[in-house]
Amino acid sequence: MDYHATIGTTRHLFGSLREVMAIATPRRSGDLLAGVAAESAQQRMAARMALADTPLATFLNEALIPYEDDAVTRLIIDSHDGAAFAPIAHLTVGDFRDWLLSESATPAALAAIRLGVTPEMAAAVSKLMRNQDLIVAARKCQVTTRFRNTIGLPGRMSVRLQPNHPTDDARGIAASLLDGLMYGAGDAVIGINPASDSLAVLIELMKSLDDTISRFAIPTQSCVLTHVTSQIKAIEQGAPLDLVFQSIGGTEQTNTSFGVTLAILDEAQAAARSLKRGTVGHNVMYFETGQGSALSARANHGVDQQTCEARAYAVARRYSPLLINSVVGFIGPEYLYDGKQIIRAGLEDHFCGKLMGLPIGCDVCYTNHAEADSDDMDTLLLLLATAGVTFVIAVPGADDVMLNYQSLSFHDALYARSVLGLKPAPEFERWLIQMGIAGEDGGIKRVAAGHPLLAGIAAQHRLGAPDGNNASGGQAHGAP
């Protein structure tokens, strides 16, 4: 197919669909680094015009990465649902954008087509959309998953509680865990990024989280975010594992660099499901992704980083995960230079994931050497929450002391819930009310020093005596 567009007296020609996609992408440092970005704003607009006129069916006939060379491409093509695609098969990319923004694109209609939308189709239409378009369309996509609670219902935003510690110290983790629970965080998952890769340490962390969840009957799930093969070994040794985690990418070579294949993920999912630890559902997988991972592994095949990211969602979709999130600014300014680029990428990732039927959240974050700050994260958080993001990640004080990057704090997540009227997962919401942590109106309450959660976790891990304030030492939201 010939890809071209004329602006004024200049005719712009593009050699392939892959080139059109890359040049049409909003400016970002990773694509400049890869040498695939537009040379000018005019060229970028011409590529968008050419892309808008491209039939969606083209993506089924012209693979950006050859079928013979890449397992992810084979997965995308072989798993494509022609019946789900039929209602939109006659559309161009531009027509698809118009339909997504129309009243015809109801939640039911979007759910019906999700298995017919390939990652490249999702990425392509996102390149034609303003930020507000990404928000409007994503908000209409409803994706619900279940393990010990129900995640993704309308009007709700879950929070991953991330109690990391640089030495995996049990007392430090417990203090962060207590802090997060007192702010109403943790309904998405209580997930630790361990500093150690020792199997004994990993299993001990799993046991500690399981003990806390069981002792206080918390309707949530835990996860220790180590390599998938270590988690399989932990299951074999009888560890109380809830969710299997793995970082994934959008090309076979990227996943090879992570030490993972589809066969390994198949094995891990089967092992986790065999434990039957879910009480309201059996979505047992948790994935993380991020724009730039393919280029950092020299595995992008000349494809722009946002399209590579969307292709990772095809891998995730195979496993019907409980959770998936983009760690949007974590990889650094080499790939997303500043707050503007991070905000745009976060909205793109959320839209593409939701359009493809994934329960996608976001680690709203940045590294300390990026041209970004907490004001940018405030903006992205509010935009994503408005767009119906499934969950966000929160750490004490927004500063992850183990991974050394800046994320959201527990009170940031509480702020977003408060100003937009969002609630936690329903089972977790009831638990917060029953425990006296939250009121019927959702506001966080001040608790007494003898509160069973404060006293229990403090005694369990020999923490200092609680003083009656929320665990972070500041005044609890909703307190007089």
Which residues make up each language-model segment?
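Long, low-complexity, intrinsically disordered segments
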Residues: 471-480
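Anaerobic metallocofactor- and corrinoid-dependent redox/one-carbon enzyme cores
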Residues: 2-174, 182, 189-467, 477
